[in-house]
Amino acid sequence: MTTLETLKWDGKKVGKVSIDLKVAKETSSSDLIHRAVLRQLANQRQGTASTLTRSEVRGGGRKPYKQKGTGRARQGSIRTPLRPGGGVIFGPKPRSYNLDMNRKERRLALRTALMSRVDDIKAVEDFGSTLNQPKTSEIINGLSRLGIEKTEKVLVILDSPSEVIKKSINNIAKVKLIAADQLNVFDILNANKLVIGQSAINKIQEVYAS
């Protein structure tokens, strides 16, 4: 179990909150997280790249010139891979890059990744409570009050983010918003700081406890 200090949106300390998630053994955690990240990135690949082989390129049925007497290298088709516009040798074809990983391992990898970042977590009781309408500057100022630099990549995790908060964060290049029940290993590891709403911590423990 880990205890985190809870901050208000104005940056003041108001209490503590505990988070207790089962993690992988130290001997296997690196490999588990590595496989989870590889799977996530591989599954994002479209795999739609496609080239034409010499049998698929249009034309080339006639021999371009006679076999002998020209002094040139012999050619049987204008669609040979040796000529411009010809087929491609061993070029890419549509394929699936998807990697498998069972649900139990995926959940364990996510919990392990999250708990490995406890030193970078800012637990906030009332994230964006002063926002009545979308305002990017208020989010930037709020993150600054929490001790986060403008140059740092931030992952904001909230239980049920409002449209006002979504629109306010949308224009900030280094800040990403994600719902507590849609976490992924890559985003957790890619951010410099994690800002988690207090209700989101409860949601995380409810959803990812097992």
UniProtKB/Swiss-Prot annotation:
Signal peptide: none annotated. GO terms for cellular component: ribonucleoprotein complex; ribosome. Keywords: Ribonucleoprotein, Ribosomal protein, RNA-binding, rRNA-binding. Pfam families: Ribosomal_L4. The keyword RNA-binding applies. Residues 44-96 are annotated as: Disordered. InterPro entries: Ribosomal_uL4, Ribosomal_uL4-like, Ribosomal_uL4_dom_sf. Residues 44-54 have a biased composition (Polar residues). GO terms for biological process: translation. GO terms for molecular function: rRNA binding; structural constituent of ribosome. Belongs to the universal ribosomal protein uL4 family. One of the primary rRNA binding proteins, this protein initially binds near the 5'-end of the 23S rRNA. It is important during the early stages of 50S assembly. It makes multiple contacts with different domains of the 23S rRNA in the assembled 50S subunit and ribosome. Forms part of the polypeptide exit tunnel. Part of the 50S ribosomal subunit. This is Large ribosomal subunit protein uL4. It comes from Prochlorococcus marinus (strain MIT 9515).
